[in-house]
């Protein structure tokens, strides 16, 4: 799975618990979008989370 180019955010793993407290594995995936941003003055297509886009840490080209 891809990870956020700016923050390094990636899939995390844990357990979900039923009412009887039985455990099963599950994962939480970040909302990643492939966008073009400027990296070292050149446009590059990278994976960026929507939270990073909304916060203004990167700007699209």
Curated annotation (Swiss-Prot):
Annotated spans, Disordered: 1-27
GO molecular function, one term: structural constituent of ribosome
One GO process term, biological-process aspect: translation
Biased composition annotated in UniProt, kind: Polar residues: 9-27
Gene3D superfamilies tied to this protein: Ribosomal protein L28/L24
Protein origin, superkingdom: Bacteria
Keywords, sorted A to Z: Ribonucleoprotein, Ribosomal protein
Keyword DNA damage: no
Pfam families linked to this entry: Ribosomal_L28
GO CC terms: ribonucleoprotein complex; ribosome
Similarity comment text for this entry: Belongs to the bacterial ribosomal protein bL28 family.
Protein name as annotated: Large ribosomal subunit protein bL28
Record organism: Lactobacillus delbrueckii subsp. bulgaricus (strain ATCC 11842 / DSM 20081 / BCRC 10696 / JCM 1002 / NBRC 13953 / NCIMB 11778 / NCTC 12712 / WDCM 00102 / Lb 14)
Gene name per UniProt: rpmB
């Amino acid at each position: 799975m891809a990870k956020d180019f700016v923050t390094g955010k990636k899939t995390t793993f844990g357990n979900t618990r039923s009412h009887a407290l039985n455990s099963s594995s599950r994962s939480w995936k970040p909302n990643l979008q492939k966008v073009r941003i400027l990296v070292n003055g050149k446009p590059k297509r990278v994976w960026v989370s929507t939270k990073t886009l909304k916060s203004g840490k990167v700007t699209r080209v």
